Design a protein with these regions (language model features):
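Bacterial N-terminal signal peptides that target proteins for export
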Residues: 1-11
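Soluble, non-membrane globular domain cores that form compact, hydrophobic packing
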Residues: 6, 23-156
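Gram-negative bacterial Sec-dependent N-terminal signal peptides
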Residues: 13-15
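C-terminal motif of bacterial Sec signal peptides marking the signal peptidase cleavage site
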Residues: 18-22
Length: 156
């Protein structure tokens, strides 16, 4: 009986260690440009507006993320060339040791989902998620496109 308890204890510890290491989310490798290209890879040309990629910097961060105090390593926005279409995807690579949950909350609370002329996205349709130190902000009017982008991000 003692042997069974010891074996059970050892197996339990091994299982816990395995689960704890499996749950640690790894950072997604690649430049913002490479990752953005992967996110859009499964879209047909006629499914999307004509998009432009814009580097997010201290001059335009408030427009894209809602708050100039967000610190990041790199960020890239994908937006339509015609501003009458509600479509914005922003990838943000945070600095090492950043409070990712805090940054996500700040983005979700402060970003303007009605920043375009005449169109917008409902606040509840704003998606802010992360994989490791990579955060995505998705504000897209079309639900199918929005969900497809979310899935593409989660599959990076």
């Amino acid at each position: 009986m003692k042997l069974f308890k010891r074996i059970s204890l050892v197996l339990g510890v091994v299982l816990c260690v395995f689960l704890m290491t499996a749950c640690g989310e790894k950072n997604v490798e690649g430049t913002p440009e490479e990752l953005m290209t992967k996110m859009y890879a499964d879209f047909k040309e006629d499914e999307l507006p004509m998009l432009d990629q814009i580097e997010v910097n201290e001059e335009n961060i408030e427009y894209y993320l809602g708050d100039a105090s967000i610190e990041f390593e790199s960020a890239l926005a994908s937006e339509p060339m015609i501003s009458s279409i509600a479509h914005s995807v922003v990838l943000v690579r945070t600095k090492d040791g950043a409070d990712i949950e805090g940054i996500k909350t700040k983005i979700k609370e402060k970003v303007n989902p009605r920043k375009w002329l005449c169109v917008g996205v409902e606040k509840e349709d704003v998606i802010v998620e992360n994989r490791g130190n990579l955060i995505v902000l998705i504000m897209v009017q079309d639900e199918t496109t929005r969900e497809k982008l979310k899935t593409a991000f989660n599959n990076l």
